[in-house]
Amino acid sequence: MKVYLGGEAEVKILENVVVKTRIPKRYRIKELDRELRLRRTKMEAKIISAARRAGVPTPIVLDVEEDTIVMERIYGEAVKDVMSKDVSREVGRMAAKLHRAGIIHGDITPMNLILSNSRIYFVDFGLAFFDNKVEPMGVDVHVYFESLKASFENWERLRDAFIEGYLAEGGSEEVIERAKEIEERGRYVERVSMG
């Protein structure tokens, strides 16, 4: 068994399942904290199932109990270890499916994607939410672009492959343009703060 402790949850990886339990926050009022953890856990499970119905490979949710989700374990390789233009193109296709279903993943990075049996599985929907607006979709895409830039020398080719897949699957050109605008905003802030 492997145990990972993140800012929001403890994740136990067992032989066939993954058990994700949201951690209580001591700084919150106890009743409020419990309510938030229950609501967020239920919402995450609902979003995982909605993503799966939209045609995006995700772990199957097996059980939801209070602040804990039990889901299928996906065996495969982290996308960060097998990244290629084809893989990034497929990530773009799946991101478009999420967005067309009104789902914002919130953390599309190679660490939260698993390649298994030639399919890209999206995992860790802890920051996900439902929204149909261009801005959060643009942020979703921007997060992926930034993760590519931080991890891969050929990030521009990987970004372009993602865009190809995203648009081919019916993703909006406006979302891609918004992701580019968000990047420019960041550059402007950097120049102003340095300057």
Curated annotation (Swiss-Prot):
Amino acids binding ATP: 12
Entry's Gene Ontology cellular component terms: cytosol
Family statement drawn from the similarity comment of this UniProt entry: Belongs to the protein kinase superfamily. Tyr protein kinase family. BUD32 subfamily.
SS bonds (residue pairs): none
Keyword list, A-Z: ATP-binding, Cytoplasm, Kinase, Nucleotide-binding, Serine/threonine-protein kinase, Transferase, tRNA processing
Entry annotation: catalytic residues: 107 (proton acceptor)
UniProt-listed InterPro entries: Bud32, Kinase-like_dom_sf, Prot_kinase_dom, RIO_dom, Tyr_kinase_AS
Protein role: Could be involved in the formation of a threonylcarbamoyl group on adenosine at position 37 (t(6)A37) in tRNAs that read codons beginning with adenine.
Record-listed E.C. numbers: 2.7.11.1
A Pfam family hit: RIO1
Chief location: cytoplasm
Protein name: Probable serine/threonine-protein kinase BUD32 homolog
SUPFAM superfamilies associated with the record: Protein kinase-like (PK-like) (SSF56112)
